[in-house]
Each structure stands twice: as C-alpha cells, then as structure tokens.
C-alpha cells in the first residue's frame, strides 16, 4: 500500500512533464519552422552579371526585397522566368550557386526574401510567405512575363510556398526541390511520441495540393537527404498529375549542388517538357 502514493506521484510527474513538453512544442513552433537571417552576406552583383535589386510590396503592404537576374538577350529561353522560393533558413544571399545553376538553363531568375528575412520587412508566417510569393509573381507579370512563362521553383519549405502559388495563380511549371509533404508529417517523424498533427498551426501541406494542380512538375530529391527523407519527394511525386518528372539529386539536404551539372541536367530535361521552352 505504501507504494501506491509513490507510484501516483511518479505518474503525475511523468504526465506533467509530458504536458510541459507539449506546451513548449506549441510555444516554440514558429522558431522551429522559421530561421531567418537579416544579414546579407553578398549582393546580386557577386554573380558578375546584370541584376536588379528590387523593392516591392505584398498585398498587405509589407515591403519585400528581391534580386532579378535577366537572361541573356540571345537565349532561346529569355522569355521564361524562374521564381525562386528559398527554404526556411538564411536569406537570398546564401543561394548564389543555385542562381548560377538556374541561369545556366537560359531563363531569367527572380529570387526574393519572405517577410522577416534579409531586407524584407515584418515577421514570417505561413500565409505571409504565400502573400510574398504572390507579390513576387505579380512583379514578374508587371515585368512583362505572362503567367504561363513563369516557373515557380521551391527549395525545401519554399516548395510548400511554390505549390500554394501554383494553386492560386497561373504558372508554366512547378519545381519542388527537397520538399517535405507537410510540416505535420515532418513533425510526426521528428517527434513520434507527441501529438504534433493536432497541435501545429503551421502546415505547408504540399502533397494535398498537388492532385488539384494542372501544371508541369519537376520533383528533385536526394536519396541521401538526411533532413527531408527521400520518401517525401516520392510521395509528392505520386500525388501529382502528369506531366511530371522525378530527378534524383546527389548530396545531402543542404548540398543539392553536390553535382552541379547533374542538377542542371534535371532542369534542362524538365524544361524540354514545357511547351515552348
């Protein structure tokens, strides 16, 4: 009988600890998802070719910053623009090698920072990133690119942003590089003993949107991705409509350009599927 009170106290202690962890997970959800960096470590001029340092506004008035790299005027793909939506960490100055690879395909490239990243105002949120991508899309439209000539390229979390843009606007193509199926799916993998699917308020549910999209899709994912497992890319690809292409990357999650020429080859093959590209 003397053990019962001790057992009760132990169970209460375990329960309270569990509840505390659950509350902390909810409290720190935003900081777990978004890792913005305000400091630009370079400018677009570092690429050694023409670029525009762009200021534009989202629909809620938030001022955003982006870099536009025009394609060479003699490029047969100069009429196409790649709208680059980066991942959850850093800012646009940390992806220069990726811009070089995209530009190597002969398209124009417009990279932008979500609110709260780099020189863009505000604080990031899921709906905020969606608004920001739409604002970047509208900037390209005003630049003279028809919607069907704009390809949304999403890196990791940016794939969720790009997929939502494809659901809201007309696009010529969609690229998902190392993109998870959803934040709840990722959370359940990282914390299988916590009810993350019911607690989370940030979703980026890419997979659920793909069956509704009617746009050419390229899924790029590495079998050795240690953060967003290969099965996420496979599931996203399986959920999408034709035409679609799956391209296995080399390297880890944060090193998609481990083989730059292989990366570019995947983009080239995808562009060949797009009418008029």
Residue positions per predicted region:
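Membrane-embedded segments
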Residues: 59-139, 143, 148
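Acidic catalytic loop of the alpha/beta-hydrolase fold
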Residues: 223-228, 253-255
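Short alpha-helix in the alpha/beta-hydrolase fold that links the catalytic acid
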Residues: 98, 206, 215, 229-238
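Catalytic active-site module of serine/aspartate enzymes centered on a nucleophile-bearing elbow/loop
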Residues: 260-277
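Catalytic histidine-centered segment of alpha/beta-hydrolase-like enzymes
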Residues: 252-262
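An N-terminal hydrophobic leader/cap segment in hydrolases
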Residues: 10-57
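Short beta-strand/loop motif that positions the catalytic acidic residue
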Residues: 212-214, 219-221, 225
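Primarily recognizes the serine-hydrolase "nucleophile elbow" in alpha/beta-hydrolase
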Residues: 136-143, 147-193, 209
């Amino acid at each position: 009988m003397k053990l019962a009170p001790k057992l009760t106290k132990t169970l209460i202690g375990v329960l309270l600890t569990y509840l505390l962890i659950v509350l902390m997970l909810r409290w720190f959800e935003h900081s777990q998802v978004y890792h913005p960096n305000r400091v630009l470590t370079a400018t677009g001029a570092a690429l050694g070719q023409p670029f525009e340092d762009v200021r534009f506004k989202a629909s809620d008035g938030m001022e955003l910053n982006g870099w536009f790299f025009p394609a060479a005027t003699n490029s047969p793909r100069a009429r196409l623009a790649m709208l680059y939506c980066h991942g959850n960490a850093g800012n646009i100055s940390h992806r220069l090698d990726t811009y070089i690879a995209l530009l190597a395909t002969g398209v124009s490239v417009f990279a932008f920072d979500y609110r709260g990243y780099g020189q863009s105002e505000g604080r990031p949120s899921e709906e905020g990133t969606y608004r920001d991508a739409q604002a970047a899309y509208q900037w390209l439209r005003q630049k003279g690119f028809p919607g069907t000539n704009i390809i949304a390229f999403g890196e990791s979390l940016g794939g969720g942003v790009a997929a939502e843009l494809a659901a809201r606007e007309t696009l010529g193509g969609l690229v998902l590089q190392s993109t998870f199926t959803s934040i709840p799916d990722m959370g359940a993998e990282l914390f299988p003993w916590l009810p993350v699917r019911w607690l989370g308020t940030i979703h980026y549910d890419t997979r659920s949107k793909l069956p509704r999209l009617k746009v050419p899709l390229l899924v790029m994912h590495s079998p050795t991705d240690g953060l967003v497992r290969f099965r996420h890319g496979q599931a996203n690809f399986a959920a999408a409509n034709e035409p679609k292409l799956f391209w296995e990357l080399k390297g880890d999650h944060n090193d998609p350009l481990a083989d730059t020429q292989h990366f570019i080859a995947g983009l080239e093959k995808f562009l060949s599927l797009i009418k008029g590209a």
